[in-house]
Regions:
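N-terminal nicking endonuclease/strand-transfer module with a His-rich metal-binding environment
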Residues: 1-122
Length: 122
């Protein structure tokens, strides 16, 4: 398993809303997106969770840089952890890098040879 920060280079991904839309969009591929998870939000709706995250970002006057962090967690080809294990891995990694209590949208992707999780962290 490899976890890494993905720099927000593309303009369409440089906002929380853009990244959340990208990672949860099936792009008309039946097997692309698996479980979508919302963590530390009041809402259980993706649209409302994104709105909530954007309001939190607007209130944050201290942060000068990008307020969205894109984390990618990749597994070895052929490795297929259970949904419970994937949630646990995400929770542990986010806690380890100091984002355990932050709002996040995550999506499991099956569109490559290796299973991976994209995590948009506010």
């Amino acid at each position: 398993m490899i976890a890494r920060h993905v720099p927000m280079k593309e303009a369409k991904l440089s906002s929380f809303a853009g990244l959340a839309k990208y990672i949860t969009n099936s792009q008309e591929k039946q097997e692309r997106v698996g479980e979508i998870r919302l963590t530390n939000f009041q809402s259980e709706s993706l649209d409302w969770a994104v709105t909530e995250a954007l309001h939190v970002q607007q209130r944050n006057q201290r942060a000068e840089g990008d307020k969205t962090y894109h984390l990618l967690i990749s597994f070895a080809p052929g490795e297929k952890p259970s949904a419970e294990m994937l949630r646990d891995v995400e929770d542990r990694i986010c806690a380890a890098i100091g984002f355990g209590e932050h709002q996040r949208v995550s999506a499991v992707h099956h569109d490559t040879d290796n299973l991976h999780i994209h995590v948009a962290i506010n």
